[in-house]
């Protein structure tokens, strides 16, 4: 039996690509995490999308809205334009991409430069749509111990 191709656009079988991350293996790079999140949208894996968002932001996610968008869309493709590791402790990265989908309103393309942070061997998406009630001098919610303004602040405030 032929395995389905991964929705992320790699051309690889799902189980050899993003499927292993969906099953719990940590994504080795921010780009791999971003690709696996696109695949999760295409496959309706809302729990994975929640679990790969910065833990301090997870409670603020609209999971019903994510589920409705995921299931109500036909996912047409992903193009990664750039992946940049920024370094630091904790390590940060940026991934610029274009995601395409079709829904009841037509065909769409969304270009985004997303921020990611690595903590304890796992990459997390920094969701700019989930507000955190923190001041710039408060400890960063990623748990690194530094101030928000010097750590993840540029991505989530």
UniProtKB/Swiss-Prot annotation:
Domain of life: Bacteria
One Pfam family per UniProt: SEC-C
InterPro entries per the UniProt record, alphabetical: NTF2-like_dom_sf, SEC_C_motif, UPF0225, YchJ-like_M
Stored NCBIfam families: PRK00183.1 (NF001213), PRK01752.1 (NF002486)
Family: Belongs to the UPF0225 family.
Protein name: UPF0225 protein PA14_50900
Species annotation: Pseudomonas aeruginosa (strain UCBPP-PA14)
């Amino acid at each position: 039996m032929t395995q389905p191709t991964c929705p992320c656009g790699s051309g690889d079988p799902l189980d050899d690509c993003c499927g292993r991350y969906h099953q719990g293996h940590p994504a080795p790079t921010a780009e791999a995490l971003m690709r696996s999140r696109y695949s999760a949208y295409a496959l309706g894996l809302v729990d994975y999308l929640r679990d790969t968002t910065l833990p301090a932001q997870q409670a603020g996610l609209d999971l019903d809205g994510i589920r409705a968008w995921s299931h109500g869309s036909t996912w047409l493709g992903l193009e990664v334009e750039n992946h940049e590791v920024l370094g630091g402790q904790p390590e940060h990265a940026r991934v610029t991409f274009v995601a395409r989908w079709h829904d009841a309103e037509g065909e769409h393309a969304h270009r985004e430069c997303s921020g990611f942070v690595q903590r304890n061997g796992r990459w997390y998406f920094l969701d700019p749509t989930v507000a955190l009630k923190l001041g710039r001098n408060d400890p960063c919610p990623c748990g690194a111990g530094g101030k928000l303004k010097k750590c993840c602040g540029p991505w989530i405030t």
